[in-house]
């Protein structure tokens, strides 16, 4: 195999990567990894899946779970849909954000370079941040004082929900745990560090490629501006088993798939139906296991 990263440039790149890894050690998530409740994850998955359904079905699920549907809307420019539901008894409001209907086209069309965000000072994916700002402006007048806010979303909607959590946090709203499913990356290492105070769980299936996007590019190492996941990654394994990964470990998992291409065929591993199916047996009791890895640092550079 011919390396896509010339050997003469590997040395400096690996040194830069070592610096990146040393910086990331301090970016642990605020999530209590011993407090993962799969019944909670299943309910959030139901709400994430509901964002793809007609309004009548969203309303029915919300009422079944003790909520009233407050708003259901689709952003015209991006076709990202979301809903806001209010639970008076629990004094909780829930925001669920849908991804796009065609993930392959959406992920191929996005600009992969991060852009500075004036509101947060962070470098964020421009399209996801723009959608999050639109949702923020629409829900802000409907958010109630003294209520906690739950956020969830699938695919691109998960990335939008995560950025929305940052905007809400900075605006002083009380956030509950944020749970996303199959979410792509949306910021860099500095941005991930800013998320330490937010309890963010990213649920993934082992063969879902969307959470590995945009792909790791070793050429960005020199600028310490590589795309990086925020929060804690929960990997759904067979039956009752699961693994938990943070920053470095999550990145190392991604390097095993850097040469695979997103296609309609492997999107079967990305669908919410599979996420619900894999979470269900864990609601009665789950077993945390180590995530197997055969990582080799030279694999990043095509060696």
Predicted regions mapped to residue ranges:
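Bacterial N-terminal signal peptides that target proteins for export
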Residues: 2-15
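Bacterial N-terminal signal peptides
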Residues: 14-24
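Non-catalytic, mobile gating and regulatory segments of ester bond hydrolases
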Residues: 29-152, 156-303
């Amino acid at each position: 195999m011919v390396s896509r990263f010339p050997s003469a440039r590997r040395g400096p790149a690996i040194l830069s990567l070592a610096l990146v890894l040393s910086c990331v050690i301090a970016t642990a998530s605020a999530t209590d990894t011993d407090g993962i409740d799969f019944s909670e994850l299943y309910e959030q998955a139901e709400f994430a899946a509901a964002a793809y359904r007609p309004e009548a079905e969203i309303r029915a699920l919300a009422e079944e779970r003790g909520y009233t549907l407050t708003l259901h809307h689709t952003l015209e420019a991006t076709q990202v849909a979301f809903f806001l539901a209010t639970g008076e008894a629990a004094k909780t409001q829930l925001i669920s954000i849908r991804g796009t209907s065609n993930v392959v086209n959406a992920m191929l069309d996005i600009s992969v370079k991060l852009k500075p965000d004036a509101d947060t000072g962070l470098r964020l994916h421009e399209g996801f941040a723009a959608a999050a700002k639109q949702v923020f402006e629409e829900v802000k007048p409907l958010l109630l004082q003294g209520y906690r806010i739950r956020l969830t979303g699938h695919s691109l909607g998960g990335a939008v929900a995560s950025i929305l959590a940052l905007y809400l946090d900075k605006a002083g709203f009380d956030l509950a745990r944020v749970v996303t499913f199959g979410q792509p990356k949306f910021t860099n290492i500095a941005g991930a560090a800013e998320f330490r105070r937010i309890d963010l769980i990213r649920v993934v299936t082992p063969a879902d490629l969307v959470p590995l996007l945009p792909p790791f590019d070793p050429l960005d190492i020199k600028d310490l501006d590589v795309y990086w996941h925020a929060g804690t990654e929960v990997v759904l394994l067979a039956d009752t088993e699961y693994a938990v990964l943070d920053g470095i470990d999550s990145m190392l998992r991604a390097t095993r798939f850097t040469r695979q291409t997103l296609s309609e065929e492997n999107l079967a591993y990305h669908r919410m139906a599979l996420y619900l199916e894999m979470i269900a047996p864990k609601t009665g009791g789950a077993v945390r296991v180590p995530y197997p890895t055969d990582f080799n640092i030279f694999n990043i550079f095509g060696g």
